[in-house]
UniProtKB/Swiss-Prot annotation:
It comes from Halorhodospira halophila (strain DSM 244 / SL1). Mg(2+) 2 binds at residues 267, 269. This is D-alanine--D-alanine ligase. Pfam families: Dala_Dala_lig_C, Dala_Dala_lig_N. Coiled coil: none annotated.
């Protein structure tokens, strides 16, 4: 099948999972699902948890499937090490990973590229204040954290300090971003292909950690209800944003569609979740790609 490497030619595969970030538990779930899929496909794949094993031991593998989420796995650090070791790996390289992890710098890059993204600013100190160009309500979040950890919707200045405190517990760089009223969508990217978009629906104030991984009432609408032209427009925008931020191989771009029908880029995820609640497998299934094939094709992107 096109894009799927021959297990006999791949060699040993390390599934890098777990780690020490705040997203360790999600990483273990993603990595476990990926490992099982690779083994079902006939690959010589093993779990490798850098919390318990030195990364130097990766020298004994031929390719690494990165299933780490958050710092130390999604921010370019492990990618840099693997580059030095000369071992191919799944997903984006050092630059794309670092930019994808840093929501503020990614936003600035998109703004400089003329891509639509909500107004935002960094918050600092014990008395954070919004600039005039960023009005309430806002979403306050750690600039370098995933899975919507540490995020709060803020309706007015009296709530800002507490939201800053919550976000700062995860990262010393805190971003305030203008709230976009409308519907949230996400687009998964696999190689050169934008997979069918997903429209997200949740009774929560936004698509937070609980909505992503715990809630049973979160709606994942795929197909999303967009017409063919709208679907193509959204897919092209997300591919452009992904490429502009240095993304490669596979990933996901989250967007909002405001009440006027305009798209707004929120963030890039260079190592999306692969759990039973995750979005990329849902989009792939809509495109006729089963989970095992999806995992094998992601591996194949690393070996192109």
């Amino acid at each position: 099948m096109s894009g799927i490497p021959d297990p006999q030619r791949v060699g040993r595969v390390a599934v890098l999972m777990g780690g020490t970030s705040a997203e360790r538990d999600i990483s273990l779930r993603s990595g476990g699902a990926i490992l099982a899929a690779l083994q079902r496909c006939g690959y010589d794949a093993e779990a490798y948890d850098p919390r318990d094993r030195a990364l130097e031991g990766l020298r004994g593998y031929d390719v690494v499937f990165i299933a780490l989420h958050g710092r130390g796995g999604e921010d370019g650090t492990v990618q840099g090490l693997l580059d030095l070791l000369g071992i191919p790996y799944t997903g984006s390289g050092v630059l794309g990973s670092a930019l994808g992890m840093d929501k503020w710098r990614c936003k600035r890059l998109w703004q400089g590229s003329g891509l639509p993204t909500p107004a935002g600013q960094l918050l600092t100190g014990d008395r954070p204040v919004l600039d005039e160009g960023v009005g309430y309500p806002v979403i306050v979040k750690p600039a370098r954290e995933g899975s919507s950890l540490g995020m709060s919707r803020v309706e007015g200045p009296e709530e800002l300090a507490e939201a800053y405190r919550v976000a700062a517990a995860y990262d010393d760089t805190v971003l305030a971003e203008a709230w976009v009223e409308g519907e949230e969508y996400t687009v998964a990217l696999l190689g050169d292909q934008a997979l069918p978009s997903i429209r997200l629906e949740t009774p929560h104030a936004f698509f937070d950690y609980a909505a992503k991984y715990q809630a049973e009432d979160t709606g994942h609408h795929c197909p999303s209800g967009l017409g063919p032209e709208e679907e193509a427009e959204l897919g092209a925008l997300c591919r452009e944003a992904f490429i502009a931020s240095g993304g490669n191989g596979w990933g996901r771009v989250d967007v909002m569609r405001d009440t006027g029908g305009r798209w707004w880029l929120l963030e890039v995820n260079t190592i999306p979740g692969m759990t039973d609640h995750s979005l990329v497998p849902i989009a792939a299934a809509q495109a006729g790609i089963g989970f095992d094939e999806l995992v094998a094709r992601i591996l194949g992107e690393a070996l192109r």
